[in-house]
C-alpha cells in the first residue's frame, strides 16, 4: 500500500477557518492527492441508522506520512519504507495521545492541528483506514473492521468539533452569531450517530459556562438561548450553572412563556427521574423556583394544581415512583427556606430564643450546630423544677405498637410515670409548651416567604388528596421533618392540619399509623395536634378523629389506653361530655380494662358517661358485659373444649355466653373460620393455658390483644395462620410460653431470634416452612 499526499496551492488552514463549523461534507485541503500502487478513494460514509458509542480510548494501527518536499524525502516515504505501529490512543478533550508516547505518536496530536478527518478504503485490500490531515503530513489510523473505523471517525469528528466550539464560544463578540452557533451546536448533538451521556451534556456545559461568564445579557437574549437549547433538555438534566441561570429567569420573568413551554417538560423529567437531590441540589432549587413562578401567574394555585395532576397522571395510580418523594423534598426545602432568617439569627429567632429562655438557663451554643437545643445540666434542671413546681413534665410511655407523649402535673400518680434520662435531649413538644410566652408568640414572615410557605403547604395538601400517594406521604412526614420554628408558627400548623386530617380519615393502617411517633422518645403528629399540643387550635375534633381511627385499627390495647389515661384523660372526658362517641368508647374501655385505679376518677368517668345518651347507652352495655364476664369466669365448666370445623366468631361468642368456663384450660379452634375478632372473647378466659389456632384466619391484631391479657398462656399453636412479624413480636410479653408453633407463617429469622431471647421458658418451637427454618 502506498499512500502519499502533497500540499498543493492554497493554505488548508485558511480554508478550514472559512468553512462552516458544522459542515457535514468536509473535503480535503485543495491540491491534496493520494498516490499509491492502487487507486484510493474517499469512502462515502453513510450512517444508515447505525449508532456508535463515543470512544474515549482504544487500540489501533497508526502510520504517519510526511509530505515529501525533496526527491530524497519522497524515496524515504515510499511504500517500501513505510510501517504501521500499534498504539493505544486516548481521545482527550484537546488532543489525540498515545498511552506509550513513542514512534509516530511520540507527541500528541492537537485537535486544532487536525485540518480534516476522512475515512479511506482500498479496492484491492481489506483495509479500513482514517485519514487525519495535519500540517506537513497525514496520519493514517487502521481499524480492524468498518464498524470500528466508523466509530473512530465519528468520535474524532465529535471531539474535534466540541473542542472548536469551546474556543469559539469562550470569547463571544456578537450575540446574534453566538446564538446561531449555539443552534448549530444543538443540531449537531441531536443528529450525531454517537450514543453517550456526554453527547448532550457537553453542549449544555458549554452554554452553561458561556452564561456564567456573561451576566450582562438582556432578557430577550436569555430567552433566545433557552429556546435554542430546549431540545437538548428533553432527555437531559441541566448542569448546575444552567440551573442557576434558569432559577434567575424564573425569579425575574415568572410570566414568561419560556417558563411554561420550555421549563415544564424539563421539571417534569427532573421529578420523574431524579434519584437524589442531595447530589444535585440546584435541580431541586430550580424545581422550587419553577413552582413559585407558576404560582405567580394569574390563575395561581390552579396552575400549580394542574401541574401536580399532570405529574400524577389520569389513572388512580401514578406510574412514576420518584415523583412523590421529589415533590416532598422540594416542599420541605422550600418550607425550611421560609424560616431560614429566623434559624440563622438568634435575635430574630423568637422560637429558639423563647424556648431557651423558657426551658433552659443560658448556656454556650455550639457554633457548628446553631439549631441544636443543648442538653441541660442536672443542676439547672433541679433549679428549674424548684422554681416551677406546677409546670408540666414530659414522660414517655412506650410500647411496640404505639408511643404516646405523656404529660403529668405534680399531682399525677407516680406509679404510672417513667423517667427519662437527664442526658437526653429536651423534647420538642416540651420546649414549645413549657413557657407561656411560647404559646402567645407570633412569627411573622415577609411577603415573599409567606407566598413560598403558602404555595408549598398547598402542594402538600394536594398530594394528600391522592389515595395512592397518601401512604408514602404519611411515611415521609412521620418523622416531622420541619424546623422547630415552623411548628411554633400558627399559620403553618393551621394549614398543615388538613394533611393530618386526611391521614386520620384514611382507613389503611399504613397511613394512620404514621400519626404516631416514629420511635420511642420522639414526637408524632398525634402529640402535636392533641389538646394541649403546640399545634392544636380546636377543641379536640382532630384529636378525636385520630383516636377513632387508631382504636378502630389495631391500637385498642391496654398500653394505648394507659397512655391516654395518663396524658389526655381530661380532654377525653370533655369530648365525651360533648357527646363524642369515640371518647365515650374510650372511657368505657378504660373502666373495662381497669386502667383507672382511683375510685373518685372512676366515679367521675361514670358521671360523664351518664350525662349523654350515647355515653349512657355504652355504659349500660359495659355493665351487661361485666355481668356476663362474671358468669363466664365463674368456676366450673369443662377444662378442655374443641370447636367443630367451620365454626365462626359468632359461634364461639354464642358458646362462651351459654355457661361458665372458669375452669377452661385447653381450647382448640383448629380448622375453624375464626378471625382476630374472637380475641375479645378469648381474653375473658382466666384459666386458659393452651390455645390451638391451627389453620384459622387469626391475624396480628388478635395476637397483640392476646399478648396483653393472656400472659399465663403456656401453649400456642399458630400453624398456617396469616400472622406476620408485626404480631409475632408482641408474643415477647408472654413469659410463660413453653410451646410455640409458628409453622408455615411469615416469621422472619430476626423475629425468631428476638423471641428466643425474650421468652426464657420456651422449650418447644416449630418454625418449619418459614424464613427462620
UniProtKB/Swiss-Prot annotation:
Task: Give the GO terms filed under biological process for this record.
Answer: in utero embryonic development
Under the heading InterPro entries, the entry gives: CMIP, LRR_dom_sf, PH_CMIP
Give the subcellular location.
Answer: Nucleus; Cytoplasm
Cite the Pfam families for this sequence: PH_21
* Record bears the keyword Cell membrane: no
Which gene is annotated as encoding this protein in its UniProt record? Cmip
Q: Name the chain's protein.
A: C-Maf-inducing protein
Q: Which residues form the PH domain?
A: 54-163
Span list, region Disordered: 1-28
Q: Name one GO cellular component term.
A: cytosol
Arranged from A to Z, the UniProt key words for this protein are: Cytoplasm, Leucine-rich repeat, Nucleus, Phosphoprotein, Repeat
